[in-house]
């Protein structure tokens, strides 16, 4: 039996290699003279990264580092236990309250990661027998949350409100939920939230919105998709956000009504049974929130980077996106790997994204821009892309 298991594993690994879907971790050391987004590769080669979700360039901010160090000196490194068992630190409570005030909702709850937050929210609020209508390009954690809930999953074509309305019109038993990314992580486009809210109201559905790639980037004070569309945030029932992207830290949160947060605190297994976020990260995230709220100059720099890149490489197979996520659709996995390798030889780090992360025949380069990039960085990327595409 032991050899049969090993043979099965090896066969699966061989299939991954044969289909150009093999993955390996890359060790990148931040370059001492500049730090992110510049790194040193395993062979000592300098690399300029276009693969990070550190959209505002906050991860290397000294103010965040100082806040984390001060909290470590006071409270230690790890939280030591689950929040309901070992208790929160003041930094946790202050951050959660600040996040709720920022978004104009009643309460927020911290989680260890966005994946845990999405699993916890959906498996707690969505019941077996409920109906979930989800965009086909939603993040995997949203799909897994629905599977864990036992609800019936109906996936509508990406951004297709007519298809969603057709599903909703069929009705059925149980509560109805519309679940969507605010900014889609692989394509970079923005969910049509006003239309989603209209359909939700028409058919009595709730909305769960994952703002992982929207917070900090879109809207007034970086408040995300609803702010981008000038919508009242209260048209959304539950909001998830991460602290590891535009915030430049790590962790996640869920925001909404006090009842929603109370229910999650008492019922969400991924909250109850997870070790609390280190308070040093909460302290750093609180500083990041202030920088993010007042980060209009950083957001404007992102817009300028995006516009300049696309203007310099106008004939590239760009996906439609008004966010820092700029996808180059290459189709074939081997083609994506080849272009990625060519960029790396030129000192640019941008890994190929292949199935199952993206649908079949849609392998791509997922180029992510940061306010920490300089104009010269974008020029170098554009020049290299013109040479290799």
Curated annotation (Swiss-Prot):
Binding positions (substrate): 23, 139, 357
Chain segments annotated as coiled-coil in the UniProt record: none
UniProt cross-references to InterPro entries, sorted A to Z: Aminotrans_II_pyridoxalP_BS, Aminotransferase_I/II_large, AON_synthase_class-II, AONS_Archaea/Proteobacteria, AONS_Proteobacteria, PyrdxlP-dep_Trfase, PyrdxlP-dep_Trfase_major, PyrdxlP-dep_Trfase_small
Protein name as catalogued: 8-amino-7-oxononanoate synthase
Single GO term (MF): pyridoxal phosphate binding
Enzyme class at the top of the EC tree: transferase
Gene3D superfamilies the UniProt entry points to: Aspartate Aminotransferase, domain 1 (3.90.1150.10), Type I PLP-dependent aspartate aminotransferase-like (Major domain) (3.40.640.10)
Organism of this sequence: Acidithiobacillus ferrooxidans (strain ATCC 23270 / DSM 14882 / CIP 104768 / NCIMB 8455)
Enzyme Commission number, as recorded: 2.3.1.47
Gene: bioF
Alphabetical keyword list: Biotin biosynthesis, Pyridoxal phosphate, Transferase
An example Gene Ontology biological process: biotin biosynthetic process
Family: Belongs to the class-II pyridoxal-phosphate-dependent aminotransferase family. BioF subfamily.
Cofactor(s) named in the record: pyridoxal 5'-phosphate
Subunit-level organization: Homodimer.
Catalytic activity: 6-carboxyhexanoyl-[ACP] + L-alanine + H(+) = (8S)-8-amino-7-oxononanoate + holo-[ACP] + CO2
Pathway noted in the entry: Cofactor biosynthesis; biotin biosynthesis
N6-(pyridoxal phosphate)lysine modified-residue sites: 245
